[in-house]
């Protein structure tokens, strides 16, 4: 092994220090709570609220709120563009996670917000055989039913079993998603197929933890 192949001296310590600094900023934050609602509220912070259900342990690294930028690029789009996104994975102690995503279109990479963009809500439902059902509804008129499994402790892969469209929805026939937590950040790639195009990348983003 050459010297260029070896890790930079102290790089491990720097990574640990960076993780500790992130935790100091995010450990006390949570999703908004309404005190006048009955029962247990949602939490995206494993330090606060109800304990994570045992069925959801394979999804534990996802729990939190994540923000960052990504790129939309696909033949079905008029043009590629950059977006800012917030993704939340929360729970209320029951055997599923609640998922919510909001995005805003940017004028350029790393630029300013110019318009609201896509929104998604859904639920991840782990099953006894390690399969994860991912039910996802889009503001653009799509409903998708994904099935997936963990690749390892910090990576999850999903593919659609069914796609339902309203009459006014965008063209879509299938999709896949790959999520991974890498060095404290959440990265994902979505592939999309349409009636005219085979499955290929459409969305990708890298998001930093802001809650949890």
UniProtKB/Swiss-Prot annotation:
Pfam families per UniProt: THAP4_heme-bd
Annotated Basic and acidic residues bias: 1-11
Region (Disordered): 1-36
CDD domains according to UniProt: lipocalin_heme-bd-THAP4-like
InterPro entries for this protein: Calycin, Nb(III)_bact/plant, Nitrobindin, THAP4-like_heme-bd
Motif (GXWXGXG) on chain: 64-70
HAMAP family, alphabetized: nitrobindin
Recorded family membership: Belongs to the nitrobindin family.
Protein name (database record): Ferric nitrobindin-like protein
Species for this entry: Saccharopolyspora erythraea (strain ATCC 11635 / DSM 40517 / JCM 4748 / NBRC 13426 / NCIMB 8594 / NRRL 2338)
């Amino acid at each position: 092994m050459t010297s260029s192949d070896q890790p930079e001296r102290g790089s491990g310590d720097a990574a640990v220090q960076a993780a500790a600094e992130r935790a100091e900023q995010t450990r006390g934050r949570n999703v908004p709570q309404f005190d006048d609602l009955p029962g247990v509220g949602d939490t995206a912070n494993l330090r606060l609220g109800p304990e994570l259900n045992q069925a959801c342990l394979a999804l534990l690294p996802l729990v939190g709120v994540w923000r960052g930028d990504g790129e939309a690029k696909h033949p079905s789009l008029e043009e590629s563009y950059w977006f800012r996104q917030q993704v939340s994975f929360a729970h209320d102690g029951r055997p599923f996670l609640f998922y919510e995503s909001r995005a805003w279109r940017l004028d350029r990479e790393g630029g300013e917000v110019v318009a609201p963009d896509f929104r998604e809500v859904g639920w991840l439902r782990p099953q006894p055989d390690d399969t994860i059902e991912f039910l996802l509804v889009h503001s653009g008129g799509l409903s998708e039913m994904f099935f997936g499994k963990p690749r390892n402790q910090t990576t999850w892969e999903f593919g659609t079993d069914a796609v339902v469209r309203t009459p006014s929805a965008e063209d879509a026939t299938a999709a896949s998603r790959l999520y991974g937590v890498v060095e404290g950040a959440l990265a994902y790639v979505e592939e999309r197929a349409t009636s005219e195009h085979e499955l290929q990348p459409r969305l990708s983003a890298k998001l930093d933890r802001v809650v949890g």
